[in-house]
Amino acid sequence: FPMVPYVMAAELVSRGDGGFANIWGLQDCAETIHEFANEEQKRQYLPRAAKGDTYAMDLTEPDAGSDLQSVQLKATYCEKDGKWYLNGVKRFITNGDAHISLVLARSEEGTHDGRGLSMFIYDKANGGMTVRRIENKLGIKGSPTCELVFKDAPAELVGERKLGLIKYVMSLMN
């Protein structure tokens, strides 16, 4: 995206409504999908951003907070059906009830640092995730901050395994 017009538009939106500004900012998830997802994922998820579907980045957890290397939400690959499944809890997720989420999850059994984490696309329409709690905030109510529970939630790997934190989240947050 051309950065100057984008930032100008974001500032104007922020003046009008802080909650909407949060939703606007999370559309950067589409940029991460554009840069790192495969062609099929791009065809499936990018047009949905233009149609108004909302996005979230599901990173923090009850025991990991901002220490993303400590993320424990598990991503398990099922050889039988060739799909990934997410299991665990995410907490303090801005816009947590979004249609599409980029989820940081531990894909490598036995790892305890950032090298065992991968990035996944989760589509709310596929089920397997429930919003357990919505934070009662003083303001910015237009963008719910949620606790999410994933139970055998189907997801798609973005890019390569083990690069979730060291490459994709760094790009997402930059």
Where are these predicted regions, by residue range?
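Internal helix-loop-helix
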Residues: 1-51, 93-100
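Buried hydrophobic positions in well-ordered alpha/beta secondary-structure cores of metabolic enzymes
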Residues: 9, 38, 57, 75, ...
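Glycine- and acidic
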Residues: 10-15, 25-31, 56-58, 87, ...
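Internal maturation/activation junctions in enzymes
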Residues: 37-73
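Flexible, glycine/threonine-enriched loop-and-boundary segments that flank and lead into catalytic domains
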Residues: 58-80, 85, 89-91, 96-100
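Short Gly/Pro-enriched turn/cap motifs at secondary-structure boundaries
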Residues: 63-66, 92-95, 111, 137-144
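A short core secondary-structure module
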Residues: 83-129
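A glycine-rich, basic-preceded beta-loop-alpha segment at the flavin cofactor/substrate interface
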Residues: 125-132, 144-174
